[in-house]
Design a protein with these regions (language model features):
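Short acidic, glycine/proline-enriched helix-loop-strand junctions
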Residues: 91-125
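Structural recognition of the beta-strand scaffold that forms the well-ordered cores
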Residues: 27-29, 83-86
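Extracytoplasmic/lumenal acceptor-recognition loop(s) of multi-pass membrane glycoenzymes
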Residues: 1-78, 137-213, 245-247
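Active-site-proximal, structured, solvent-exposed surfaces of multi-pass membrane proteins
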Residues: 185, 189-319
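Short, polar loop motifs at secondary-structure junctions
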Residues: 87-91, 244-247
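Structural motif
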Residues: 1-3, 86-89
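Generic recognition of flexible, low-complexity loop/linker segments
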Residues: 16, 70-75, 109-111, 216-218, ...
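Solvent-exposed loop/turn and edge beta-strand elements of beta-rich ligand-binding domains
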Residues: 130-132
Length: 319
């Protein structure tokens, strides 16, 4: 959705995050309540900059491109975002001129605190499938680094007297995201041995190695809060799943998932039926076990103290 400061008339300019609540989960919000916890956030704010004449540009140290409806819609297609909500006359006019958008409905006008009229207009984005086969094999960057400062950002320059807090340069994932020519060859932080490798300093010169069969069909896509499943016509071709990568995702019927640019997942189906499930990591299981042991130990110590106090009370009561 288009960002504008006038949304504060609802109490906060982030009010559209409640779209899932008001639409009975029919529509989601790309910008969520816990967006600080996701490495997909920087890419969202780049989209917001392209799709909002007056964006918030909330994440620092990003090369914001400015309002560009065509570039913004290409990014929504890349990220599998199906709808775009425009409010300002400038954004609505640009959206109506974009051939990849279909106007669905509008409501309003509403008055902003500045006395301006606003219509909310919803557009459907074409070619925004949530799961797609990839044309070329992902290229694994070496040395492997999953940290946001090696993926989204580059190394921060040394501070100087003139620049005590210099901005971070963009990392390989951001550079890739802003160059549509490279989108057919995702960058990866890890992957099978047959995927090509390249030094991360040369990421933008990554080779294009064709995938085994990029024309496979994907069907029966189903998504819940904790699982994603789909069917492929032929196993073996890497498939891009346009959902934020996190180590808790586990694949059944496929190898992976592997983290790829911008911050999505690729799996390599070994069967026709593929399921991704969001479970617990080893660190979480360890933390859970330690928590249970801590509770048990606390109860045991408490009971021991109670028995000691009871024994002392009995001794003091003996004539």
């Amino acid at each position: 959705w288009e960002y504008e400061s006038g949304l504060s008339r609802f109490g906060t300019p982030m009010a559209p995050m409640l779209l899932p609540y008001f639409t009975d989960q029919c529509l989601g919000s790309m910008e969520g309540l816990y967006f600080e916890a996701s490495s997909t956030t920087p890419f969202h704010f780049i989209n917001q900059s392209e799709l909002s004449p007056n964006p918030s540009s909330a994440q620092r140290d990003l090369p914001y491109p400015g309002f560009d409806m065509d570039a913004g819609i290409r990014h929504l297609q890349l990220m599998g975002v199906k709808y775009y909500l425009a409010a300002s006359p400038q954004a609505i006019e640009a959206a109506r001129a974009n051939p990849d958008l279909t106007e669905l409905a509008s409501t309003g006008p509403f008055s902003t605190p500045a006395g301006e009229d606003r219509d909310w207009t919803v557009f459907e984005v074409a070619d925004a499938d949530p799961v797609v086969p990839i044309e070329n094999l992902p290229v694994v960057l070496t040395p492997e680094d999953d940290h946001i400062d090696g993926w989204v950002y580059g190394e921060r320059p040394e501070a100087t007297e003139e620049a005590p807090n210099p901005p971070k340069p963009s990392g390989p994932a951001i550079d890739w995201y802003l160059d549509p020519v490279r989108w057919d060859t995702p960058l990866a932080t890890s992957g099978p041995d047959e995927w090509p490798r390249i030094d991360r300093e040369s990421a933008m010169q990554a080779p294009s190695v064709p995938a085994p069969d990029p024309d496979i069909e994907i069907s029966d896509y189903t998504e819940t809060n904790e699982s994603i499943s789909f069917t492929v016509s032929e196993p073996g071709t890497p498939v891009l799943v346009k959902t934020s990568y996190f180590p808790n995702w586990q694949a059944s019927g496929a190898e992976g998932p592997y983290r790829v640019s911008p911050n999505f997942m690729v799996v390599v189906p070994t069967e026709n039926e593929v399921t991704l499930t969001y479970g617990r990591s080893m660190v979480e299981w360890l933390g859970l076990v330690m928590t249970i042991l801590g509770i048990v130990l606390t109860v045991m110590l408490g009971r021991g103290d109670q028995r000691r106090m009871d024994a002392e009370a009995a001794l003091s009561a003996t004539p």
